[in-house]
């Protein structure tokens, strides 16, 4: 129990110190975007956020006398984060739609664009408009309005949803899709800067007004944003920002497709350190909770029976529901910041699986071992500590190590709540370099470099326990 207290203390300390999203100070203007939508938001060759939306966000913060803080998060969860009060506004090229206006209020539009179909220059399917794409695969980024438009207006088109433009570009280069639909300005800019053989075809599918959503309970902030946008239009600031990224013959000073090797290495290593930190904290929390949970799953007599059924129901629920849903529930439903939400979710998930492993280990010990220890006059605690637990633990080591490996891999899920772990950092690099195969491979090898030794370590620990006489064949 002494070690358990130490482990739990370290876990709670990690929870307190590791949160990258401190509560917003009143003087801060906290905005969200994806960081994967160049030229509106992306990481430059030094690894810093840049782009049209980034500049607009900082300019608005300056004009409303607040300090700008920009959070990069996943697009498919960005509105949920706003409604959960994780940030003040979204300045991420969000189109104003009636469905979105039901849950948030939008500023006046700060630019106009439209949806455009792009295909490979070779155009093997010979399509020149979206109406000719029936039965063909057209890609969009998950969560964008183009997906709903195509599904509603062109139900015979097979809509393929992917996480980023880089993944779409890779699919189209391999000709696994016919084309993709995206913002006309964004698509043209990305294709040019990434040097891909894609061309727009047909007319714009529809026009879009792009605004800044805020929560409906924050009309004062909405008024300040609208005032700032109007002033930026009047004094030419908005036009200058637009020229910086879209002016004739102009490109961003941080050209897309390039990122310093040292910056790439730093981002990957920092992201992996975050992944390992989350995994370690969740493992410690999960193991501390798994031991008593495993005992309660094993013993169901007398006064322990109600607790047994309570723990059994909880463990079955955790094991029977997707980790991603649990993560979103803890983050949005409980209102926790990303790091505590990730550690708590993965820790409880690990507890559920490790508790079952411990239960199986305890039940595999020959009952005669406990009877023999009882005949020698050992107390129940001593029988457990010196006879039952060493044998059960040895049996449980290989599956427990599998739980550790699975937990480390599950950290890849936490990118959806804006934690800059390894996969999120790899995606930010891919959004600039458009080389998904290379950087996903590197990320996979980094995980393997840790998980493979862990699998071998389990064999060594098992042999060590046997050699010290804690267990036998």
Language-model segments: residues:
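Short glycine-rich His-centered loop
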Residues: 27-52
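Alpha-to-beta junction loops
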Residues: 30, 66-67, 84-92, 136-137, ...
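Beta->alpha turn/N-cap motifs
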Residues: 33-37, 71-76, 85-97, 120-121, ...
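Periplasmic-binding protein-like
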Residues: 34-35, 100, 111-121, 184, ...
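Short helix-initiation/N-cap motifs at beta->coil->alpha
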Residues: 37, 54-55, 69-80, 125, ...
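Acidic, polar ligand-binding/catalytic clefts
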Residues: 54, 58, 62-132, 195-205
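Extended ligand-binding regions for polar small-molecule ligands
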Residues: 54-64, 121-124, 131, 136-137, ...
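Transmembrane alpha-helices and adjacent helix-loop boundaries
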Residues: 142, 254-473
């Amino acid at each position: 129990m002494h070690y358990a207290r130490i482990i739990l203390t370290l876990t709670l300390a990690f929870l307190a110190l590791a949160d990258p999203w401190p509560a917003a100070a009143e003087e801060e203007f906290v905005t969200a975007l994806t960081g994967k939508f160049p030229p509106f938001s992306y990481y430059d060759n030094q690894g810093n956020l840049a782009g049209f939306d980034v500049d607009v966000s900082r300019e608005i913060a300056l004009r409303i006398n607040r300090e700008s803080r920009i959070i990069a998060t996943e697009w498919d969860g960005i509105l949920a984060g706003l409604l959960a009060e994780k940030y003040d506004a979204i300045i991420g090229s969000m189109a104003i739609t009636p469905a979105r206006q039901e849950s948030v209020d939008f500023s006046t539009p700060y630019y106009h664009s439209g949806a455009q179909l792009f295909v490979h220059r070779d155009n093997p399917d010979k399509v020149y408009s979206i109406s000719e794409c029936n039965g063909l695969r057209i890609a969009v980024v998950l969560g964008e309005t183009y997906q709903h438009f195509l599904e509603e207006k062109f139900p015979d088109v097979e809509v393929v949803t992917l996480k980023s433009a880089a993944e779409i570009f890779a699919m189209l280069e391999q000709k696994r899709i016919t084309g993709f639909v995206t913002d006309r300005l964004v698509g043209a800019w990305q294709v040019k800067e990434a040097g891909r053989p894609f061309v727009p075809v047909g007319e714009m599918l529809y026009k879009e007004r792009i605004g800044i959503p805020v929560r409906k309970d924050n009309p004062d902030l909405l008024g300040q944003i609208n005032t700032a946008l109007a002033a930026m239009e009047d004094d030419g600031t908005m036009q200058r920002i637009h020229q910086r990224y879209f002016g004739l013959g102009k490109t961003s000073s941080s050209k897309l497709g390039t990122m310093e090797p040292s910056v790439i290495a730093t981002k990957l290593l920092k992201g992996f350190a975050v992944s390992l930190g989350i995994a370690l904290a969740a493992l410690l929390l999960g193991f501390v909770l798994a031991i008593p949970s495993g005992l309660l799953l094993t013993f169901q007599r007398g006064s322990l029976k109600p607790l047994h059924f309570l723990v059994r129901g909880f463990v079955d629920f955790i094991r029977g529901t997707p980790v991603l849903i649990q993560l979103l529930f803890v983050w949005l439903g409980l209102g926790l910041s990303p790091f505590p939400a990730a550690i708590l979710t993965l820790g409880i998930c690990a507890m559920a699986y490790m508790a079952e492993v411990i239960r199986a280990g305890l039940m595999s010990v020959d009952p005669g071992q406990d009877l023999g220890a009882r005949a020698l006059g050992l107390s129940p605690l001593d029988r457990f500590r010196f006879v039952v637990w060493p044998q059960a633990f040895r049996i449980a080591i290989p599956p427990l190590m599998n739980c550790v490996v699975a937990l480390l891999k599950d950290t890849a899920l936490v990118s959806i709540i804006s934690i800059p772990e390894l996969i999120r950092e790899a995606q930010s690099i891919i959004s600039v370099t458009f080389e998904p195969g290379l950087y996903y491979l590197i990320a996979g090898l980094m995980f393997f470099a840790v998980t493979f030794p862990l699998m071998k370590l389990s064999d060594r620990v098992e042999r060590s326990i046997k050699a010290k006489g804690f267990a036998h064949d």
